[in-house]
């Protein structure tokens, strides 16, 4: 087997001054062909999931933590020969307490983009809680993916994903109905509860992102209007009620296809930050916008790229 190396660049910030930043490269050695990494920071520690494939194209989802300046022994969470393995739509995970929830994709039919989201819930020790269970229970042979997961402070997880169940139907003009984005909660026993559609028309293949503020879960994604404006939108749950989605900023980017470029959101108490790619007015840019009000509104975006950007 060929040996591949994944290099992880970690920013280590020392407390002496805010300017003392050292970038340290940490090598990660693992046999097989490895790809689709998902690196997560939780309570001061790092964890990583990735897909390995063997010479027969069997895929496995692996999990590892970085503790005490070294990687723990890898755990294989799931194995299959019927997976959808893709550079843009990849597995993700989150840690809540002593549990880790991971996602991966399985083909549901012969179509190129007919696949379902499967989940695996276990303790960090490796003890299985619920294995290989499906997230989207609609039963339609359509695209389901682009998953984001975050821990719920009350134990369990919040999860969001793109759901293509409606794309099998057609509009009056003959075009297929658009992709949707959905949300659910996963309990610490692996039950799927409080599932809801957040938006009935979103970009088909742009990554989603989710965070948890003191008010509740907040989701950002690339919207899709009837006029093919594909700007970044945000919606949040306050007092267990999801608010109407609003734009993070009105870029006005019109594009007649999916750019495969989703946003990223992070939060700290009432502060929320969203970054995203846009080509507003024909000028590629990576923007960053901040909210001091739990994501209810955002300030003007800050362009953070000096040169031309592609995503």
PLM feature spans:
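Sec-dependent N-terminal signal peptides
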Residues: 4-13
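Extracellular, repeat-based ectodomains that mediate carbohydrate processing or recognition
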Residues: 16-311
């Amino acid at each position: 087997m060929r040996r591949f190396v994944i290099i992880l660049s970690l920013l280590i910030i020392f407390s002496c001054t805010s300017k003392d930043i050292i970038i340290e490269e940490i090598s990660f050695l693992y046999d097989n062909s490895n790809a689709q990494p998902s690196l997560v920071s939780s309570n001061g520690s790092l964890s990583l999931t990735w897909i390995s494939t063997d010479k027969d194209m069997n895929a496995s989802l692996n999990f590892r933590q970085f503790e005490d300046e070294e990687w723990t022994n890898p755990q294989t969470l799931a194995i299959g020969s019927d997976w959808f393995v893709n550079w843009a739509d990849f597995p993700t995970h989150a840690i809540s307490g002593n549990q880790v929830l991971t996602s991966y994709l399985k083909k549901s039919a012969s179509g190129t983009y007919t696949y379902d989201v499967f989940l695996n819930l276990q303790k960090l020790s490796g003890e299985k809680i619920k294995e290989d269970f499906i997230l989207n229970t609609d039963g339609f042979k359509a695209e389901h993916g682009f998953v984001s997961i975050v821990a719920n402070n009350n134990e369990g997880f919040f999860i969001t994903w793109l759901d293509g169940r409606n794309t099998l139907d057609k509009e009056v003009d003959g075009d297929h109905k658009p992709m949707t984005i959905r949300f659910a909660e996963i309990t610490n026993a692996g039950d799927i509860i409080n599932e809801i559609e957040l938006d009935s028309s979103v970009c088909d293949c742009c990554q989603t992102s989710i965070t948890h503020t003191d008010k509740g879960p907040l989701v950002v994604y690339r919207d899709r209007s009837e006029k093919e404006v594909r700007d970044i939108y945000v919606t949040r749950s306050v007092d267990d009620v999801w608010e109407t989605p609003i734009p993070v900023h009105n870029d006005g980017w019109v594009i007649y296809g999916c750019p495969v470029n989703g946003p990223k959101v992070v939060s700290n108490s009432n502060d929320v930050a969203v970054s995203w790619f846009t080509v507003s007015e024909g000028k590629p840019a990576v923007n960053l916008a901040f909210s001091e009000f739990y994501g209810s509104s955002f300030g003007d975006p800050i362009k953070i790229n000096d040169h031309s950007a592609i995503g």
